[in-house]
C-alpha cells in the first residue's frame, strides 16, 4: 500500500487521519466557535495544529488542552506551540473528563475534527460527561452529522438521533467541502454545535432503558412497534400511552420513546 505524507507526516489510514488545510475554512470555523481567553478549551485530535494555531491567535489563551494519540503528531505539536499547549498523549476513549474539568476548575469547551472511524462511538462516550461540558463543536462526516439532528419520519432518524438530542441541543453550522482536507475524503463534512441541556426537555427516570428500547426498536426499523417491541410491551400497553402500535421506529418522537422508557422502568 502506497504511503501518503502530509507536511512530512506519515498519514495513518487505520486512524482515518485527514488534515484540514483550507485557511478560509479554518478561519470560519474558529470564528463560529468564538473562543474566549478565560475559557478552557480542549481540542480532540488536533493533527498538525490547523485549528490550534488559529484559536491561540484569536483568543490569546493562556493554555489550550490537546488530546492526541499519535506520538509523531504529539512531538510536532510540542515543537510548534511549546508552552502554549497542555498536550495529553492518550486515547480519547479512555479520557476522564470529570477529572479534567475538576483540574481546570470549570466546564470544558470541546472542539475537533473527529476521525470518521470513531466519531459515533466517541459522541456517545462523551454524553456521560455532559455535566462538565459547556459545549462541543465537532466536524463530522456529513452522513453522520445529518443523523445527529434528524427528525422523526426522516430516513436519517434513528437511535443516534434520539440519544444525541436527548442529551444536547444540536445545531448544524457549516458544510465543509471535501477539497478542504488532505487526503481528500469521498464525502463532505459538517461542523456541528452540541450544547448539553441544562434542563432536559425529555424527563426520564433511567437513560439505560431508553438506550435498550431504541436499540431494539431500530434493530429492524421496518417492523411495527407491536412487533419490534413485543419483548417489552404488549399492544395494549403501547396504545394506553397514546402511541399507535402500527407505527414504525422512525415515526416515534423522542418524547414518546421517553414515555415508553419510563413505562419499561416501572415494570
Curated annotation (Swiss-Prot):
It is an enzyme of class 2 (transferase). It comes from Blochmanniella pennsylvanica (strain BPEN). Its main location: cytoplasm. The keyword Membrane does not apply. This is Ribosomal RNA small subunit methyltransferase A. GO terms for molecular function: 16S rRNA (adenine(1518)-N(6)/adenine(1519)-N(6))-dimethyltransferase activity; RNA binding. It catalyses: adenosine(1518)/adenosine(1519) in 16S rRNA + 4 S-adenosyl-L-methionine = N(6)-dimethyladenosine(1518)/N(6)-dimethyladenosine(1519) in 16S rRNA + 4 S-adenosyl-L-homocysteine + 4 H(+). S-adenosyl-L-methionine binds at residues 20, 45, 68, 91, 113. SMART domains: rADc.
